[in-house]
Amino acid sequence: MLTLQEKLANLPTTPGVYMMKDENGKVIYVGKAVNLRNRVRQYFQNSDMTPKTRLMVKKIKDFEYIVTDTEVEALILECNLIKEYRPKYNVLLRDDKNYQYIKITNEMFPRLVTTRKVEKDGAKYFGPYVSGYSVKQTIELLKSLFMLRTCKRKFPDQLGKGRPCLNFYIERCLGVCKGDIPEEEYQKLVEKAVKVLSGKGDEIVEELKKKMFEYADNLMFEKAQEIKNKITSLEQIITKQKVIYADDRSEDVINYAEDSSNICIVVLVIRNGKLINKEEFVLKNDEEVFERFLEQYYSDVVSVPKEIILPHEVGNGENIEKMIEKLYGFKAKIVVPKQGEKKQLLEMAKKNAEISLVNKQRIENYYIEALLHLKNLLGIEHDIEKIESYDISNLAGADNVGTLVVFEDGKFNKDLYRKFKLKSFEGQDDIRSVKEVLTRRFTNLEKHGRLPDLILIDGGQNQVNAAVEVLRSLGFNIPVAGMVKDDRHKTRDLIYKGQELNIQRDSLVFKLISTIQEETHRFAVKYHRELRKKHLYESILDEIEGIGEKRKIKLFRIFGSIDNLRKASIEEIVKAADIPYDIALKIKEKIGI
């Protein structure tokens, strides 16, 4: 096996990508180079490096490289490898799974669905949407307007087989599965949905208005009212899209604000003259961070316009333009305006970035101070950067469950949240529950990230003692505190080392602990609701004669919940689930007509 120095001596002088690895073989940095030999050697020969780069170089124990034909190919490969490995020392954009997209699939009778993953599968993607509620609302409006399918049936194999699902009976789907809807007719509706999501909804409104007036002129007032309702729904989407230009130009306007620690980059997404989205990225400020951001952003974005508006020239601008042409098949131009509308939009983006940066700094300062006060209150020597908060609960003595919420680096890290369905005993026993949850968590270290600096238990001294006992038996010396609640289930005090520590209600520590406890409680309640819904559905249907496992699964697949089943008529249950009338009647009698 070659040593590091031998590998450095044998590096080629071609373009390519290099991957730096630590002692565990983990990729900690991915970079690109016009000349691999010169670039990689610089890390080990150059003394003029930033502190961050110097720290990274100390951890490099090995490296690999991939040769490419051109610098642009190296840029594309670098972006892909950064997404795959998410190295510690690279500029990392958001993890896409935290954001939702609306997707219109690329298949026979395309589906309208939400997704957290953008793939190169020929589908049309719109987003990202930060608000899950906004996505759900938009999907529901589009279903009511264009009645596109959301089911997972495979066509043409399942065309004309089986009955339509509930969406057909409540007029949220055309029921293409019946096999009597022409594909061309359906495709026109898909194109209209695409127009709405692309910022061209005004065209659809005008079409609907013409149709509404035609119905009214022919005294078909009910039909006219239906169209009017659709127009109102459509305008709810359109009003969120601010008009920027009188024409239908499309462009991305990108600007940033920075301080010594962070940079906030704002992307104003303008399509067909309307501002349809604003994206914000807060990153650690480092050399060339803006250029690195542009490379990653345009290596895998849902929609690329013909113009990209920037506040100044960037050294890699030409390569970014070439990368876009290679990836997306058309030329995009980077523009740096000196005056006019585009310059004003850059100022708007910068102002938004400045506000976000100030807010982030305010929140960071609050948490830094709160964590420092908490450290002093508990008398802990080390800094508190990661807190794990646990909740134990049960459903009337059954289904004992535990939940874990993680507060890390000043924010909740939902990627590390965990649910535990307790298996080692039956009945209600908080102490055994705490022991099982902590044992499972701390004997499976790889799935939970770094060790916490503090553990919070939603409970009193007994729960704290149980947690400490487990940790000591496993060789861990992690501080554990109990979150004591008042009669209204709100934070009162902390229990630590056998003492109840009084926390002032207006203190930063109280606000921090309350925030963590409320999030822990919210996550536990959400898990309980999922289990309760499952049990309620199973127990009610299990009591009905004529409902076996297959019918139960079918009813759940079609209606989704007892509430939806309760809202459906007997006739709708018969048609949608293809079951006898007398059994549908029994269902309604059991769950309440």
UniProtKB/Swiss-Prot annotation:
One of its GO terms (cellular component) is cytoplasm. Residues 202-237 form the UVR domain. Keywords: Cytoplasm, DNA damage, DNA excision, DNA repair, Excision nuclease, SOS response. It comes from the Bacteria. SMART domains: GIYc (SM00465). It is found in: Cytoplasm. PROSITE patterns: GIY_YIG, UVR, UVRC. Residues 13-91 form the GIY-YIG domain. Coiled coil: none annotated. Belongs to the UvrC family. The UvrABC repair system catalyzes the recognition and processing of DNA lesions. UvrC both incises the 5' and 3' sides of the lesion. The N-terminal half is responsible for the 3' incision and the C-terminal half is responsible for the 5' incision. NCBIfam families: PRK00558.1-5 (NF001824), uvrC (TIGR00194). Interacts with UvrB in an incision complex. This is UvrABC system protein C. It comes from Caldicellulosiruptor saccharolyticus (strain ATCC 43494 / DSM 8903 / Tp8T 6331).
